[in-house]
């Protein structure tokens, strides 16, 4: 993303042929927007739709046992920033200052480890569900299905796992207690 004005960012930069599954804007963050706005300056030649979903219906479709486990534990997001894979830490944190990255991590409860001068591992446990500020309903609100390795095309996931192992993946998600999220749970969430 690029910042085009103070707190105004472009959408995720992604291939025009690609598909980004439905998700909650910045739910992996400690501070997410109350509102999002959409604008298209240059429409794509084909497709280009932005689907929206009623989160009450989405939450209701997820079985109670799954909701309760995520509600109890939250989601642990693991990111590995580096020049050879995904984003660099400078791109991800939009700064060249390691001190600023560390201050941000301390402020947001994110654990971090500098693996070397160019690579950073960050782990954060966040909520899996939130209480809606107006209705009071507890709703599904996370990126577990997006960050998890199973969201990658299978051939890419296998290649990355062979190359860097599970702990070196650019991103992955676990239950907040660090245990793996089962494939069938993710299949249910994505259904």
Describe these PLM feature segments:
Residues 2-24:
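A gly/proline- and charged-residue-enriched helix-loop-helix capping module
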Residues 3-5, 27-28, 43-46:
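A short acidic, glycine/proline-enriched capping/turn motif at secondary-structure boundaries
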Residues 16-22, 31-191:
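Active-site environment of non-heme Fe oxygenases that use a 2-His-1-carboxylate facial triad
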């Amino acid at each position: 993303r690029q910042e085009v004005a103070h707190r105004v960012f472009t959408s995720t930069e992604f291939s025009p042929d690609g598909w980004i599954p439905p998700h909650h804007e910045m739910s992996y963050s400690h501070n997410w927007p109350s509102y999002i706005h959409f604008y298209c300056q240059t429409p794509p030649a084909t497709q280009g739709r932005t689907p929206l979903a009623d989160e009450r219906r989405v939450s209701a479709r997820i079985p109670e046992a799954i909701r309760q486990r995520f509600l109890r534990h939250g989601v642990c997001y693991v990111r590995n920033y580096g020049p050879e894979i995904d984003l660099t830490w400078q791109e991800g944190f939009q700064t060249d200052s390691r001190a600023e990255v560390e201050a941000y991590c301390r402020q947001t409860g994110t654990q971090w480890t500098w693996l070397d001068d160019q690579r950073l591992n960050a782990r954060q446990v966040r909520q899996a569900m939130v209480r809606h500020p107006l209705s009071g309903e507890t709703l599904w609100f996370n990126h577990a299905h997006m960050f998890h390795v199973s969201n990658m095309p299978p051939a890419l996931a296998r290649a990355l796992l062979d190359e860097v192992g599970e702990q070196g993946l650019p991103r992955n998600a676990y239950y907040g207690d660090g245990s793996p999220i089962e494939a069938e749970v993710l299949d249910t969430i994505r259904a």
